[in-house]
Amino acid sequence: MTSTLIPKETSTPGGRDLRDARADYFFKLLLTAAVAFVLIALVSAALSMLWGGRQALQLQGVSFFYSTEWNPVENKYGALTPIYGTIVTALIAMLIAMPVSLGIAFFLTEVAPRWLRTPIGTAIELLAGIPSIIYGMWGLFVLVPVMTDYITPFLNDHIGTLPLIGTLFQGPPLGIGTLTAGFVLAIMVIPFISSMMREVFLTVPTQLKESAYALGSTKWEVSWNIVLPYTRSAVIGGMFLGLGRALGETMAVAFVIGNSVRLSPSLLTPGTTIAALIANDFGEATETYRSALLLLGFVLFIVTFAVLVIARLMLLRLSRKEGN
């Protein structure tokens, strides 16, 4: 009789469980290290800027954050003007970009024929990848002359004479200024926000939209009453991500804002932002001036972080209302 050879088991169930447990442990360790690296980098960046700005903080005290005087020759530094410019340009950009981005996303998902959706969507995604310096050069050589010859005179003549808001639109026809920087920022963030919203709108179940169309709803009614409420949380999150990007933009703004550290209520006069001021002056700054710029960087970090925290809190509140 021939005996059947039974192969010897090279591993036991207990040994395999031990290897799986070890692999799972190292996997968790790797993920924990990745998260810890991000947190350490975030805290280190903030603390390094705060430590670098300690000299300016000791020199100016708390007045650094609310003073409008910026005079490196006399070692007087007030951050209110660049903070104001940063917030105002970002808000102008979002006021323009949000409705335009919503319109583009609705067009690509609800209105455009199928053969047109892919090329337009691809073009928008390509626009989102263009370097910011290209937008800045376009703004300087194309948008600034248009602002000088047409838009600024029109605003001065028709809106600058109105009560309350007229002060915002009075100024010399220089072309460069806070409003121009807001326009350039809007053009930059529109592809980013519209691409995000388009992907979000595609997650709406087809059955919901088809049911609404079957009841006689128009495309506008479906978009406004079905698509937008269904994706409201994601839309708000995308809006705040776009705002965070606008707050930190540097080169495009530096080309067209005028780089003047003088606080003015007019949107047509030159101004500056935190990022633009740091980019323009950091290379040639003295020790004290460099300390003030580092402290400005810390302020920008706090502003951007606060915006993202507010966005997160709003999303949590919305999710609780929706029962999630």
From Swiss-Prot:
Pfam families in alphabetical order: BPD_transp_1
Membrane-protein topology: Multi-pass membrane protein
InterPro entries for this protein: MetI-like, MetI-like_sf, Phosphate_PstC, Phosphate_Transport_Permease
GO cellular component terms, semicolon-separated: plasma membrane
TM regions (residue ranges): 29-49, 87-107, 126-146, 173-193, 235-255, 291-311
CDD domains linked to this entry: TM_PBP2
Family of the protein in this entry: Belongs to the binding-protein-dependent transport system permease family. CysTW subfamily.
The name this protein goes by in its record: Phosphate transport system permease protein PstC
